[in-house]
Amino acid sequence: MAAPGDGADLEASLLSFEKLDRASPDLWPEQLPGVAEFAASFKSPITSSPPKWMAELENDDIDMLKELGSLTTANLMEKVRGLQNLAYQLGLDESREMTRGKFLNILEKPKK
């Protein structure tokens, strides 16, 4: 049976301090070419100012993002289904109103 100290020696002998960087594209090819350069081009979000799209958000928008981020997958899918149903219903309503406008000749250009 092995002594308790042998496990630590074995573990120490298995450690490797070799740096596995992408210096050799033949040994370590990128799975998606260009991703490393793309990721390196962005500054750390901690040190840089917020992105342009976030500067335009209001508090209600941020609260909605936090709420959506806290939903489970099933709840998020239910929310998406509800939004799809609402968009479909709005499309039907718009179609009805456009047909109504056509029958009432509201959309015709006036004749000169």
UniProtKB/Swiss-Prot annotation:
This is Protein lin-52 homolog. GO terms for biological process: regulation of DNA-templated transcription. GO terms for cellular component: DRM complex. Component of the DREAM complex. Belongs to the lin-52 family.
